[in-house]
Amino acid sequence: GVDVLIGAHDHRPLVARKGETVYVNSGARASAVGHVEVSMERKSKSFIGMEFRPEVALLDKNRVDKDMRCRFASDIDAVSRYTARPVGSLKMPLLSRESFRGMCDYINFLHYVQIESSGADISFAAPLSFNGTIPEGTVRVRDLFSIYPYENQLYVMSMTGSEILSYLEYSYSQWIETESEHLLRIRPGRDERTGSDSWSFVGRTYNFDSAGGLNYTVDINAPEGQRIRIESLAFFSASATPEIYTVAMTSYRASGGG
């Protein structure tokens, strides 16, 4: 059987036991490590009295190993130089939080890049952070991670018109709250640090997909499955047919993520 099962990346830190198996998962974003202390007694050619003490140990970013920092100083410097490279400029800031109110410069920028770089008819994209910001002025490599923090690749898929419509209906159904005083699906909570009331979205921001390259409207008062009305392609496409369209999206979404 399996004595210890160690997981990673799954977003919820967890220490658990099931039968004789110990499970430890450190969570995401390298904020903790899974640690299991094992003690046993060797008897002849086998081990007896095995005990497992699992824990999730939080990492303190302020307690840096000096020897490790010295060992990797040249690598840290190389990354710093690379991320400081200018790649362009902006005449206005890009704010990901504006995506939740409708069309905005941030989400339009993602759609533009995906369509222009792939040649696709349509783009699916989502705000990958709630409050990512790039100020106006010079844009550097490190700024791009503020609005696009994940290492996805760009995929292009062929989809029918009905599939595109169903995709958008599903996306907006996860966000729109028709039978409520709120426009979007939010839930109340409590800030554990202050004890004050707080609010959060029911869904993850990176699942709030919209479409670029399409002229369409969303009726927030309509029932689920009847909210989207697609009017036309935003740009002429010689390759598109009434049945099949090319759609650019992240590899995460193309493989079924979200």
What spans do the regions from the language model cover?
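N-terminal catalytic scaffold of extracellular/periplasmic and nuclease hydrolases
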Residues: 1-42, 96, 100-111, 115, ...
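Basic, gly/Ser/Thr/Pro-rich low-complexity segments located predominantly at protein N termini
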Residues: 13, 32, 50, 82-89, ...
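Feature captures C-terminal
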Residues: 108-258
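Active-site-adjacent helix-turn-beta-strand microarchitecture at beta-sheet edges
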Residues: 1-85, 175-179, 183
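A short C-terminal boundary segment appended to hydrolase-like catalytic domains
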Residues: 40-139, 147, 199, 223-225, ...
